[in-house]
Each structure stands twice: as structure tokens, then as C-alpha cells.
Regions:
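Solvent-exposed soluble domains appended to multi-pass membrane proteins
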Residues: 1-238
Length: 238
């Protein structure tokens, strides 16, 4: 049942109610483990959502309202999911599919790309906080490691909980490709243009970028190019 929708689709609560019903039906009819991918849309412009759920009016059309409603609906989902027989044997991964904006003072403003990520499985995975530079591409290898899966990896990502984990991140816009390793951020742009920035944290911005003269680290530039070329070749293979 759809109780609220906008140009993007149904509100998060309606989507989660459908998930609860669908997973319940799946669990009732088969003993085979299942995988579900859920995409919610309320945290998108025009940021409209059902009235009376949060303190910010549903017609205010504020990003903060979209975020608050997203949080509210997610909490409601976990509350309902915790009552289901499949909850105790399920691992939940929550993250954003992209950042809110890529506009800033530099080609790729790193502070805009900081998104949340959560792996949640009470009773299966002990709570902890990972204070490392981790990319979306690291989520699957990390999850597979937590599940104890044995597999041949073709991932670019790594297990973020491994002692051998190397902190790095891939970020991009429609025009530029970025590669962060250590405190050096390499940006590849059209027409063979490249720039490197050094992270110089400030009180306001832990990822403040300072443009370097020339290319101080040819090694990191070569690595960025090779990684993106390898990815492109793999994705366009016959």
C-alpha cells in the first residue's frame, strides 16, 4: 500500500514495509539464504515526506528534513525487522549510493564525499568503529570476510578490518577521476590533465586540499592511471 509518494517514488516507510512483507514471504517459503537490495529515495529533492513524522514540516523542502526523515524511517524499519524470525540471522549493510553535491573550491572537494556506512548484525558481529579511509568498494570484501566466505577475489576493494588493509579511496565526478592515498589526492581530468593536492586539515575541514606545484608523486599518478585504466578495460571486456 502506498501512503505517500513524490516524483522519485514512494516514501521510505512504504518501501520498508514492502521489504518486511517480501522478506517474510521469502523466509516462509524457502530455507535458502536470501539477498535483498533496497534503494530509498526520500532523501532527494524536493525532500518531501509524510506529515507528522519529524519536527521539520513535510512541506519545508529542506535537506535536513530529508536526512531526519531518512533516519526516522530507518529506525522504524529496524524496530519492525527485529520482530521478524529472520532478523537474528541477517546482516544489514546501510550506506549512501553517492554524496549530496560535488560542487566546491577544488575539482573534487573531498569533504563532500564523506558518506555514512554501517554493517549491522546484533549477535553476529561485535560493534566497533572503523576510523580509516574506506571506500564503497571495500564494503563487499569486508562483508565477505565477516561472513567467513572463501572466494577468488576480483575486487578492487579490500577487507577494511584486515591488518593488511591499505587506506585509499576512489572518488569521481562526471568529468574527473580522483585517487586518494596517504595525504596525496590525485585528480585525472580530460585531455590528459592531472593535478595533485596535499591534505592540510583545518578546524573546519579535515580534508582541506592544497594544490601542489606540478606532480610531486609520479608514483601515485601512475598508480591512479593504471587502476582506472584496469577498471575501464575490465568493464568493457567482450
Amino acid at each position: 500500500e502506498v501512503t505517500f509518494a513524490n516524483i522519485w517514488g514512494v516514501c521510505d516507510e512504504d518501501a520498508y514495509d514492502k521489504v518486511i512483507r517480501s522478506l517474510g514471504e521469502r523466509a516462509d517459503t524457502t530455507a535458502v539464504p536470501f539477498f535483498a537490495h533496497v534503494m530509498t529515495v526520500s532523501n532527494h529533492r524536493p525532500y518531501t515526506y509524510p506529515a507528522g513524522r519529524i519536527p521539520i514540516p513535510n512541506d519545508a523542502k529542506l535537506r535536513s528534513g530529508g536526512v531526519m526523515y531518512t533516519d526516522y524511517a530507518l529506525g522504524r524499519f529496524f524496530e519492525e525487522a527485529s520482530r521478524q524470525p529472520w532478523f537474528a540471522n541477517t546482516v544489514f549493510v546501510v550506506t549512501a549510493d553517492h554524496c549530496a553535491s560535488s560542487a566546491g573550491k577544488t575539482e573534487i572537494p573531498l569533504e563532500k564525499y564523506h558518506i555514512p556506512a554501517l554493517i549491522f548484525a546484533p549477535g553476529l558481529i561485535a560493534p566497533r568503529q572503523v576510523d580509516k579511509v574506506v571506500s564503497q568498494i571495500d564494503l563487499m570484501p569486508t562483508l565477505f570476510s565477516l561472513l567467513g566466505m572463501d572466494y577468488d577475489s576480483h575486487f578492487f576493494g579490500q577487507d577494511a578490518l584486515s591488518d593488511d588493509f591499505r587506506e585509499r579511496a576512489f572518488v569521481a565526478t562526471y568529468q574527473d577521476l580522483g585517487y586518494l592515498e596517504g595525504d596525496v589526492f590525485t585528480v585525472l581530468s580530460p585531455v590528459n590533465r592531472a593535478e595533485q593536492y596535499r591534505i592540510s586539515p583545518t578546524e573546519e575541514d579535515r580534508y582541506n586540499l592544497v594544490l601542489e606545484e606540478g606532480i610531486p608523486s609520479q608514483e601515485l599518478l601512475d598508480r591512479a592511471i593504471s587502476l582506472y585504466q584496469t577498471s575501464s578495460a575490465w568493464n568493457t571486456r567482450p
